[in-house]
Amino acid sequence: QVPVFDPFPKYNPIDVRIPRPSATPVRPSPPASRAPPPPPPPRPVVPSQPLPAPAPQPAIVPARTIPQASSDGHWIIIKQAKDQANDGSYRWNYETENGIAADETGALKAIAPNEDGTAAQGFYSYTAPDGTPIRVTYTADENGFQAQGDHFPVGPPIPEAIQRALAWNAAHPEEEVETPARRA
């Protein structure tokens, strides 16, 4: 027979007897023998000559204080400019009260017949939460966005055998062979 789940099981009463508190207070029994009192603490030694005063320590002054965010999380822009020329060139920059800054210049550039693109270069800078100054300089053009900064991680050097293989491939480009899959 399969047991049936009962959501409201019935239990037999349990006889629990709780002792009633005594009307007379219980006092701890005195110790069987008294231990001797502890010896008095040693007296401090007072030097006969006054101690020399410690040398003053130089005050630590931070090189630059980093302002904290305002209560609403916004910073005041202390410098901002934007210039747009008729030839398509431009420049913009800004700086905020907490030290964030950015500057970019750009111009139209022919990247293909009847097709122009923008070539830009600039930087942005800020202070990381740990106090490290961060500055990224960049170029953005037909070769993509290329950023540089001292804080970027550096990968391991390319092994010499791979460098030789890359140099050989660059010196000996293969002519593209048309295959049936490449015909459109």
From Swiss-Prot:
Biased composition (Pro residues): 27-59
Organism of origin: Schistocerca gregaria (Desert locust)
InterPro entries the record matches: CHIT_BIND_RR_consensus (IPR031311), Cuticle_Struct_Prot (IPR050468), Insect_cuticle (IPR000618)
GO cellular component entries: chitin-based extracellular matrix
Region span, Disordered: 1-66
Annotated GO MF terms: structural constituent of chitin-based larval cuticle
Coiled coil (residue ranges): none
Protein name: Endocuticle structural glycoprotein SgAbd-1
